[in-house]
């Protein structure tokens, strides 16, 4: 969402935080990035979800997640979904499950393009009370499905991308977008035409946030600017590459930086 906002897209965030210092920091951080937080719910006495990230000398990361108790307590009844029906794109990682699935259904009914970015593996999703069956069921409301590599392989039971697509086509008729780290990214359109883009050849300082940068940049060009899948993948790859050249999840480029770094 922050990457989209930095590229000049008008964005809002729906979710829940506690009224603790972490929650206040989250809200301030989003507002500082020009992300609308009107649909954010503040839960009194609750602890905000947060992470600690350890990075090695090669830029690889290990994430320690503290779920808190604000995030998973969010329900559909607490949210105002009017912003969804007026949006151009609804993006979700399907967490927390019930309000996220409700959002997908409302977006689809309103004709809003939907993007489901499964950011964690199947085991983690199940630990967060989302079953494999519920993930697959959500795909019928999804225009672009972008699972992480581990999640994709666990979900489909294979590491062969063409076989992954054959499996997923029973559930999702939209675009399938697979990010593969150093191996680049691969996409299949609705007609199963395959697009492959290599990763950037650069020195990685910290890969944290690269996937978020990729997705935000892809959505910006493909969903909002109607750029082709392949060209959007190339743009997203360069933005994600830029993110890897600095420390932290927020080293993603703004529009001016993207215009110089990405298109140079």
Task: Describe each model-derived feature in a short phrase.
Residues 6-88, 259-264:
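Conserved N-terminal subdomain of the carbohydrate kinase-like
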């Amino acid at each position: 969402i922050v990457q989209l906002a930095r590229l000049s897209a008008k964005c809002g965030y729906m979710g829940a935080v506690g009224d603790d210092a972490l929650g206040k920091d989250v809200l301030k951080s989003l507002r500082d990035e020009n992300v609308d937080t009107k649909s954010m719910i503040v839960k009194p006495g609750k602890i905000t979800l947060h992470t600690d990230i350890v990075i090695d000398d090669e830029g690889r990361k290990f994430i320690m997640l503290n779920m808190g108790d604000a995030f998973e307590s969010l329900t559909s009844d607490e949210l105002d979904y009017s912003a969804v029906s007026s949006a151009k794109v609804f993006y979700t990682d399907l967490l927390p499950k019930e309000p996220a699935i409700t959002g997908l259904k409302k977006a689809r009914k309103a004709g809003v393009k939907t993007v489901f970015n499964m950011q964690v593996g199947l085991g983690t999703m199940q630990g967060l009370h989302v079953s494999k069956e519920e993930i697959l069921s959500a795909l019928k409301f999804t225009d672009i499905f972008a699972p992480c590599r581990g999640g994709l392989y666990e979900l489909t039971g294979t590491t062969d991308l063409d076989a992954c697509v054959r499996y997923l086509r029973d559930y999702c008729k939209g675009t399938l977008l697979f990010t593969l780290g150093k191996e680049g990214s691969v996409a299949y359109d609705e007609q199963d035409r395959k697009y492959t883009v290599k990763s950037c050849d650069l020195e990685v300082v910290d890969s944290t946030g690269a996937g978020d940068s990729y997705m935000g940049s892809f959505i910006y060009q493909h969903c909002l600017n109607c750029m082709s899948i392949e060209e959007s993948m190339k743009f997203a790859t360069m933005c994600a590459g830029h993110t890897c050249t600095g420390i932290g999840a927020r080293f993603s480029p703004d529009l001016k930086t993207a215009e110089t770094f990405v298109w140079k």
